[in-house]
Design a protein with these regions (language model features):
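Hydrophobic/basic alpha-helical segments enriched in Actinobacteria
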Residues: 16, 23-28, 33-34, 67-70, ...
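N-terminal beta-strand motif that seeds the catalytic metal site of vicinal oxygen chelate
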Residues: 1-19, 24, 75-78, 128-141
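Vicinal oxygen chelate
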Residues: 4-12, 41, 63-92, 94-141
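Core segments of cupin and vicinal oxygen chelate
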Residues: 8-58
C-alpha cells in the first residue's frame, strides 16, 4: 500500500461537516474536531478528508485565493467496488443533507455526484473491471 492521500476542504461549520461525514458512514480521526479549527475524516484506508474552518484554510492557502466550493472547480471522485455501492453511498449522503447533482449509468460504468453542505462536489463511481480493460485507453497486453 502506498502513502496516505488527503483532500483538504474549507468548511463554514465544522460541527455540521462532522455530522454529515459520519452520517455518510465515514469515520473520524480520534483527535479530530476538538477546537482546533480542523478535523480529519477517514474515507477508507489510506484516504482522508481534512476539513478546515474557512479561517484555518485561508491561513493555509493565503489571502485572495479565487473560487468557492460552489464553483465545483474540483470534483472529488471515489471509486467503489460495485454498482449497488454507488447508490448506497450517495443515498447516505442525501439522507445526511447532501444534494444530488448528476448521475450516469452506461452499464459498464455507474456514477452519481452529490454536493456536501459546503458545496464540495463528490463523484462516487464504479467501473466494470472487465469493461475497463477493453477500453481503448487500456491497450491489451
Amino acid at each position: 500500500m502506498g502513502p496516505d492521500e488527503f483532500i483538504t476542504l474549507p468548511v463554514r461549520d465544522l460541527e455540521r461537516s462532522r455530522r454529515f461525514y459520519t452520517r455518510l458512514g465515514w469515520s473520524l480521526h480520534p483527535s479530530s474536531f476538538r477546537g482546533s479549527g480542523s478535523g480529519t475524516v477517514l474515507i477508507r484506508e489510506g484516504e482522508h478528508a481534512m476539513v478546515l474552518s474557512e479561517d484555518r484554510h485561508r491561513h493555509l492557502v493565503g489571502p485572495g485565493t479565487p473560487g468557492t466550493p460552489a464553483d465545483a472547480s474540483v470534483v472529488n471522485a471515489l471509486s467503489v467496488d460495485s454498482h449497488d455501492e454507488v447508490d448506497a453511498v450517495v443515498d447516505r449522503a442525501l439522507r445526511a443533507g447532501g444534494t444530488e447533482v448528476d448521475a450516469q449509468d452506461y452499464g459498464f460504468l455507474r456514477s452519481r455526484c452529490f454536493r456536501d453542505p459546503d458545496g464540495h462536489q463528490w463523484e462516487i463511481l464504479w467501473v466494470d473491471p472487465a469493461a475497463a480493460t477493453r477500453h481503448p485507453a487500456h491497450p491489451q497486453r
